[in-house]
Amino acid sequence: MKLPIYLDYSATTPVDPRVAQKMSECLLMDGNFGNPASRSHVFGWKAEEAVENARRQVAELVNADPREIVWTSGATESDNLAIKGVAHFYSGKGKHIITSKIEHKAVLDTCRQLEREGFEVTYLEPGEDGLITSALVEAALRDDTILVSVMHVNNEIGTVNDIAAIGELTRSRGVLFHVDAAQSTGKVEIDLDKLKVDLMSFSAHKTYGPKGIGALYVRRKPRVRIEGQMHGGGHERGMRSGTLATHQIVGMGEAFRIAKEEMAQENARVLALRDRFFAQIDGLEELYINGSMTSRVPHNLNVSFNYVEGESLIMALKDLAVSSGSACTSASLEPSYVLRALGRNDELAHSSIRFTFGRFTTEEEIDYAAKKVVEAVSKLRELSPLWDMYKEGVDLSQVEWQAH
């Protein structure tokens, strides 16, 4: 077993060796290095063939038409393209957008930008279980609503929203529905032939593919129109200009092909690992699971250890790569906005740790990690006067602290 142990698979995943091999074949002079847009010679034709094969592999994982897949630089760009693209194209129809308070920053900050441009955005509050329901969406719908954007799987707490029910609602009301699915490919079944979803964002690096490549699903029937945000050579049917990165696209295609083949057994294995880990830390007092345990992806466990500062726990767990909050916001010392939206107080939000397991996690690593967590939490609590007061039965919420 090698240290440190990586337990932050929701931040990023290592590239699968099979993916790296396919990518390496698209770089050198004797490989498939051509520009897919070069129509006048065999180097371009071969590259285009590889790109279209990858487009088909991405489409097959989510049961879409390959023509509905648009390449982007990642899920952040896909979110921007979907939300701004719809808002700008359909602004004559209405200027109201619905999203939730626990979306990824790529969605929230895009919506904030649209607010500066004169759009109105409603931010839904999840229940304590971290779920956004169709009833919540329905209550916020208005005559001038043009778009609903709700994530499939939450990046911090791993909860899975019922996008099928939300899709039925939005389609019946003639409102477009965008789903950020960066965290769900390879973990949750997605069937875009059945789901009434109009736009869906994908990322390669959350699914054992390379960073810097993603895709946006744009439905053809009923047809969804978006305004391109990147202008240039008119690539991707005008929706996203820029020379296609063959090696990254091929990597994403291969990663999604593997995800389709191995998802069922992979999920069962990772769920067993998570259950094994949780069983070993469950004996700790004042341990709170964040988000629903039933509507949740198998690889995520987000827990708060009361009376322990999350940052100090991460420092104590120097052999474990884990995070508090998401990777994109872990540099800030603010408590997780996702956990605050669930109704957690600042103390519990600050004491949360996200453990995420994946393809290369072993039982040996799980057992070692659980042992280290129990030791670190117990040690930090021994040092905490608040823990002593709690153990003595003092109600800390009633204590009036003196300011110095």
UniProtKB/Swiss-Prot annotation:
Give the active-site positions.
C328
Q: Cellular component per GO?
A: L-cysteine desulfurase complex
Kindly state a single biological-process term from the GO annotations of this entry.
[2Fe-2S] cluster assembly
- Provide the positions where the record notes the PTM N6-(pyridoxal phosphate)lysine: K206
Q: Which cofactor does it need?
A: pyridoxal 5'-phosphate
Main enzyme class: transferase
Q: Which family does it belong to?
A: Belongs to the class-V pyridoxal-phosphate-dependent aminotransferase family. NifS/IscS subfamily.
Q: How does it assemble?
A: Homodimer. Forms a heterotetramer with IscU, interacts with other sulfur acceptors.
Q: Do you know which NCBIfam families this protein is assigned to?
A: IscS, PRK14012.1
Q: What is this protein called?
A: Cysteine desulfurase IscS
List the source organism: Pseudomonas aeruginosa (strain LESB58)
Task: Give the taxonomic lineage as stored in the record.
Answer: Bacteria, Pseudomonadati, Pseudomonadota, Gammaproteobacteria, Pseudomonadales
